[in-house]
Swiss-Prot record:
A motif (NPA 2) lies at residues 198-200. It is a multi-pass membrane protein. GO terms for cellular component: membrane; plant-type vacuole membrane. It comes from the Eukaryota. A motif (NPA 1) lies at residues 85-87. The gene is TIP1-1. The keyword Transmembrane applies. This is Aquaporin TIP1-1. Coiled coil: none annotated. Its main location: membrane. Expressed in roots, shoots, leaves, tassels, ears and embryos. Expressed in meristems and zones of cell enlargement: tips of primary and lateral roots, leaf primordia, and male and female inflorescence meristems. Highly expressed in the root epidermis and endodermis, parenchyma cells surrounding mature xylem vessels in the root and the stem, phloem companion cells and a ring of cells around the phloem strand in the stem and the leaf sheath, and the basal endosperm transfer cells in developing kernels. It comes from Zea mays (Maize). CDD domains: MIP.
Length: 250
């Protein structure tokens, strides 16, 4: 069971060169993702005068985030695993695929990457505000369920295409599959709660603009969804027992 495989690791791991390189890769990947995702929304808003709230703006956001995440996961995959998301890291932790200390190091890197991306966007766009997440036409509990379900789908996709040792050649399309599910989920939930699925994505803009409304939804929902996906996939679909190969007569 995953609970038996959860590892705390050692605090010394935080200072290990390999862990630090992986964390820096997470920082860069998250910066790339948030800069492109948030920046596309800011550019669309400037061009259309509030356009991100329109159907065209929603489609543009979905496409931009899908492409940006595809790239961000790809460039980090061989170094850190390309999590780019605290919920993905948490899902990997509860599934026994990353230690607690390395996971916390990833979290710090991801939050810093998002924050730096938002500060860079504000500086390089003449002080234009970054987009923050909020609820439109749904209650806080409905938004929480949305975030749980959408993030479950995201982390389940990560497990199926990137974590599962049986993935084989499917692993080569993992980044694009992960980008696609995020883009599709933005089309589903973007009009209701912004479709974060990623605490880092909502944290950076909130910190830079100092607007913390409903921020807990964008932490609790993704962490529950990511954790459930990690536990379920590990329990049901990943075998950790040795299976003897059938004997063959020569």
């Amino acid at each position: 069971m995953p609970i038996n495989r959860i590892a705390l690791g050692s605090h010394q791991e935080v200072y290990h060169p390999g862990a630090l390189k992986a964390a820096f890769a997470e920082f860069i990947s998250t910066l790339i993702f948030v800069f492109a995702g948030q920046g596309s929304g800011m550019a669309f808003s400037k061009l259309t005068g509030g356009g991100p709230t329109t159907p065209a703006g929603l489609i543009a956001a979905a496409v931009a985030h899908a492409f940006a995440l595809f790239v961000a996961v790809s460039v980090g995959a061989n170094i850190s695993g390309g999590h780019v998301n605290p919920a993905v890291t948490f899902g990997a932790f509860v599934g026994g695929n990353i230690t607690l200390f390395r996971g916390l190091l990833y979290w710090v890197a991801q939050l810093l990457g998002s924050t730096v991306a938002c500060f860079l966007l504000r500086f390089s766009t003449g002080g234009q505000a970054t987009g923050t997440f909020g609820l439109t036409g749904v209650s806080v509990w409905e938004a929480l369920v949305l975030e749980i379900v959408m993030t479950f789908g995201l982390v389940y996709t990560v497990y199926a295409t990137a974590v599962d040792p049986k993935k084989g050649s499917l692993g080569t399309i993992a980044p694009i599959a992960i980008g696609f599910i995020v883009g599709a989920n933005i089309l589903v939930g973007g009009a209701f709660d912004g479709a974060s699925m990623n605490p880092a994505v909502s944290f950076g803009p909130a910190l830079v603009s100092w607007e913390w409304g409903y921020q807990w939804v964008y932490w609790v929902g993704p962490l529950i969804g990511g954790g459930l996906a990690g536990v379920i996939y590990e329990l049901l679909f990943i075998s950790h027992t040795h299976e003897q190969l059938p004997s063959t007569d020569y």
